[in-house]
Design a protein with these regions (language model features):
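Structural recognition of an alpha-helix C-terminal capping motif at a helix-to-coil junction
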Residues: 34, 48-55, 59, 68-80
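Short, Lys/Arg-enriched C-terminal cap helix and immediately downstream tail that follows
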Residues: 87-90, 125, 130, 165-177
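Arg/Lys-rich amphipathic alpha helix in sigma70-family domain 2
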Residues: 59-66, 76-96, 111, 174
Length: 177
């Protein structure tokens, strides 16, 4: 197994090495898919967003600043693509409210059910808050990285994150969590 660093693989990619691209895809695909699926809630759309992220990586590899994390750069590209898709959807579709799930005993719930409830709560957030929440809380990006990914100021990121956290907490309280 090749243990080349992301920086080394990016240097190879800039030279046209398709094997380097395959290694980068293998290394980062799962994280990007989790991000895209969490934001879009649709497997096909998430797959498309990840595919477009790697196409942009291939086409624009020279724009990558090797002093920064490649994972963060890829998350930024993917999140922007998802954000564009969410804006497109908002223009074309009405928001569908989800039915709340009543939880009698949260201690008896399986981890998968808790995750499903969290995802359900996050899915009800407006697109900006959802993107900020996912990038910051789930993907672990720093506020300045989220700001760069979403074209917001760090203050806007913090404000959106505060509202998103409050909303998610309130939704989870309704489930008894």
């Amino acid at each position: 197994m090749n243990s080349a660093t992301d920086i080394e693989l990016m240097q190879q990619l800039r030279g046209g090495n398709e094997a380097a691209l395959r290694q980068l895809i293998e290394r980062h695909r799962e994280r990007l898919y989790r991000l895209a699926y969490g934001l879009l809630g649709d497997r096909d759309a998430a797959g498309d967003a990840v595919q477009e992220t790697f196409i942009r990586l291939w086409r624009h590899s020279r724009r990558y600043d090797s002093s920064k994390s490649l994972a963060t750069w890829l998350c930024t590209i993917c999140a922007r693509r998802c954000y564009d898709e969410l804006r497109r959807r908002r223009r074309h579709y009405a928001t569908v409210a989800t039915m709340p799930v009543e939880v009698v005993n949260p201690d008896a719930m399986a981890t998968d059910e808790l995750i499903a409830l969290l995802n359900q709560a996050v899915a009800t957030l407006p697109p900006k808050q959802r993107v900020v929440y996912r990038l910051r809380e789930i993907e672990g990006l720093a506020s300045d990285e989220v700001a760069a990914a979403t074209h917001m100021t760090t203050d806007q990121v913090k404000a959106n994150l505060f509202v998103a956290r409050t909303t998610v907490r309130e939704k989870l309280k309704k489930y008894g969590i």
